[in-house]
Amino acid sequence: MSDPTTAEIANEPRLITETGLDRRIADIIEPVLVQMGFRLVRVRMSGQNGLTLQIMTERNDGTMTVEDCEDVSKAVSPVLDVEDPIDKAYHLEVSSPGIDRPMVRKSDFVRWQGHLMKCETSIMVDGRKRFRGKIVSVDEEGFRLERDQPAYGEEAVVAIPFTALSDARLILTDDLIRDALAADKKAKAARAANENFEDEDRDIE
């Protein structure tokens, strides 16, 4: 599976989505995020600090700054106030996915191929529902995971279809930290260069 283009990433649907109230909130805020150039990663209501609405999002290039979090919070707050999906007082928390991020789109698996992850499936796959290992390949239908500790009699590599996924996230390792920081630096440099180019274009006009 080849690396997706910027346009494909911006419009790529999530493999793992919410249910119930979380789903309703996601449906309300996602159009706002898309218009701002962000992608929704996850919505979750929790009882932490009273009632907390956690919105996890990122730019289409995978970056996210503190200022971005503030901008998203300011943009979605009035929309949520109008739609009013939550009938109690709550605290809004906007964050990046983090380095040990949830994997919710096919492009996440392509981007982090070679790294360690853990996942759960909604159906039995090769006799189990929980897996931990390294992503060795990705195609349109799913990915192949090299188990880090296969049980006796288990194949070292298992094929997991995307349609079976119920939860997936990266596992924090030194290699992941190194590659994630390098990717973030590269993406921010590219965005800065593009913004400078657009500024020069406006000056010429």
Swiss-Prot record:
It is found in: Cytoplasm. Signal peptide: none annotated. It comes from the Bacteria. Its main location: cytoplasm. The keyword Transferase does not apply. Keywords: Cytoplasm, Ribosome biogenesis. One of its GO terms (cellular component) is cytosol. InterPro entries: Ribosome_maturation_RimP (IPR003728), RimP_C (IPR028998), RimP_C_sf (IPR036847), RimP_N (IPR028989), RimP_N_sf (IPR035956). Required for maturation of 30S ribosomal subunits. Belongs to the RimP family. PANTHER family: RIBOSOME MATURATION FACTOR RIMP (PTHR33867:SF1). NCBIfam families: PRK00092.2-5. This is Ribosome maturation factor RimP. It comes from Sinorhizobium fredii (strain NBRC 101917 / NGR234). The gene is rimP.
